[in-house]
Amino acid sequence: MERVNGEDIWQDREIRFDVDHKLLRLINGEIQVAKIEHVEDTKGNNGDRGTMRVTNLRLIWHAASMPRINITIGWNAITGVQSKQTTSLVTRNRGISNEAIYVLAKVSATTTKFEFIFTTTNPASHSKLFNTISSISRAYETTKMYRELKMRGVFIREDGTLKILPQETIIEKVNGVWNLSTETGSLGVFVITNIRVVWYAEMNIGYNVSVPYITLYSVRVRESKFGMALVLETTTSSGEYVLGFRVDPAERLQNLLKTVQSLHKAHLLKPIFGVSYVKEIAEKVEPRKDDDEIDIIDNNEDDVEIDDKIRPDAFASYFDGEHTATDEKQLPVLNPELGLAIEPIRNGFTLHDLWNIHVDV
């Protein structure tokens, strides 16, 4: 069978601004849960209305007037969701305040924090959006076994059986499989399901590993100091692990290789991310449809793209400084250069930095 290499899925892990419209399309396994029109990005584009899409992997917002202004926020980056009173530019002149959704996020492996504020035009839309975001966020947090490699976990029962996940089916159980991660190797059991491969030691079920197909870069057989072995390599975002397993005889090893490669390929075509959402009767989950993916973006490219390539730094617009979810923001102070009271500028930044315009070349 032809070997198929997996790819890093960034959609649920990263925060990106103003991406190409192709990157806003739903990927395999991504499901649109809700679509709310007339949602204002109050912090970064105050006064500009747009569309918010909630999927099982991320939040997607784009401006209605210029779809190239957009945000994609992966659930793995979101650290908190709150509902607060705020005043948007649209309603400020009428003296009206709205409930807004505050999304707190953090870039993985860094201390950089972001704060996003989204405001809807009516209470019904706000409630629907807030409830959906909160529910999907909780669902994502509680289903990491579908998407992350786990070692020495508690997914094996005392009797040596695997704790099955929802939507998971055991395909094959193989005894007498050696894990080659130690000098002498450890004898154990290999369990193959439609979602992952699991190995655990016969003498110690706490010594185990669970490898979802979504984390796999490649599956192959190659030479090791123990002889020919089944080698699982994980993607960069999954730690780039190289896991070796040996099973005899060679024919049995080849059959194991074909089974895992086949399931890996099938899972890449239709991944199971584990994030589910029970909608109300009046609502309807919208799965991926090619015809629907394009409607959020104008695909007609203009000859002149100056307006599309110039935008104030999106990073600075949403940068949350050193505030935590419970911190109170500092009161405004007088800035002599402007003659106005402004929020204190964070250490390391200047007034000039805040006015600087970044041009993509």
From Swiss-Prot:
According to the UniProt entry, the coiled-coil residues are none
Give the UniProt subcellular location, in the record's own words. Cell projection, Cilium membrane; Cytoplasm; Cytoplasm, Cytoskeleton, Cilium basal body; Cytoplasm, Cytoskeleton, Microtubule organizing center, Centrosome, Centriolar satellite
Molecular-function GO terms, alphabetical = phosphatidylinositol-3-phosphate binding
Main localization of the protein? membrane
Q: Where are the transmembrane segments?
A: none
Query: What InterPro entries would the database entry show?
Result: BBL5, BBS5/fem-3, BBS5_PH
| GO biological process, alphabetically ordered | cilium assembly; intracellular transport; protein transport
Cellular component GO terms held in the UniProt record = axoneme; BBSome; centriolar satellite; ciliary basal body; ciliary base; ciliary membrane; cilium; non-motile cilium
Top-rank taxon of the source lineage equals Eukaryota
Deletion phenotype:
Single mutants do not display any obvious defects in ciliogenesis. Double bbs-5 and bbs-4 mutants display a defect in cilia structure and function. This is characterized by increased accumulation and mislocalization of intraflagellar transport proteins and impaired movement of intraflagellar transport proteins along the ciliary axoneme. Double mutants also have defective polycystin-mediated cilia signaling and mislocalized and increased accumulation of mechanosensory receptors pkd-2, osm-9 and odr-10 within cilia.
Q: Which family does it belong to?
A: Belongs to the BBS5 family.
> Subunit structure, per the record?
Part of BBSome complex, that contains at least bbs-1, bbs-2, bbs-4, bbs-5, osm-12, bbs-8/ttc-8 and bbs-9. Interacts with bbs-4 (via C-terminus); the interaction is direct.
Role = Component of the BBSome complex. The BBSome complex is thought to function as a coat complex required for sorting of specific membrane proteins to the primary cilia. The BBSome complex is required for ciliogenesis but is dispensable for centriolar satellite function. Required for BBSome complex ciliary localization but not for the proper complex assembly. Required, redundantly with bbs-4, for cilia biogenesis and both the assembly and movement of intraflagellar transport proteins along the ciliary axoneme. Plays a role in the removal of degraded mechanosensory receptors within the cilia.
The identity of this protein, by name, is BBSome complex member bbs-5
Organism (species): Caenorhabditis elegans
What are the top taxonomic ranks of the organism?
Eukaryota, Metazoa, Ecdysozoa, Nematoda, Chromadorea
Gene name on record?
A: bbs-5
